């Protein structure tokens, strides 16, 4: 089921649980572009400043509780383009490195 929620920090934007980002004022879905590693990013404006943010981080911050205050997000199915909430999990940096090492041998 598709759901849109306001991002907790970037309050001018709605985040879809599947990985789309929409400007609340214009209603337009923002275009993304990929960084050097192939992860989608988007430019967000807040208080007159523009910041480039990874889409997976916006989805995780909006939809996935983070009671342990981890700062790293892992793509469960190893597809960096699948930014759906069910494919993301918070973890610590060292755990994410273990996942990445394991991925090299899959």
Annotate each predicted stretch with a short phrase.
Residues 1-73, 77-106:
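Conserved recognition-core residues within compact binding domains
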């Amino acid at each position: 089921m598709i759901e849109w929620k306001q991002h907790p920090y970037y309050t001018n934007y709605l985040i879809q649980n599947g990985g789309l980002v929409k400007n609340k004022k214009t209603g337009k879905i923002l275009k993304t572009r990929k960084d050097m590693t192939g992860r989608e990013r988007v430019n967000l404006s807040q208080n007159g400043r523009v910041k480039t943010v990874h889409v997976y981080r916006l989805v995780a911050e909006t939809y996935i509780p983070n009671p342990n205050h981890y700062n790293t997000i892992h793509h469960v199915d190893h597809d960096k383009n699948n930014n759906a909430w069910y494919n993301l999990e918070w973890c610590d940096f060292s755990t994410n490195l273990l996942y990445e090492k394991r991925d090299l041998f899959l």
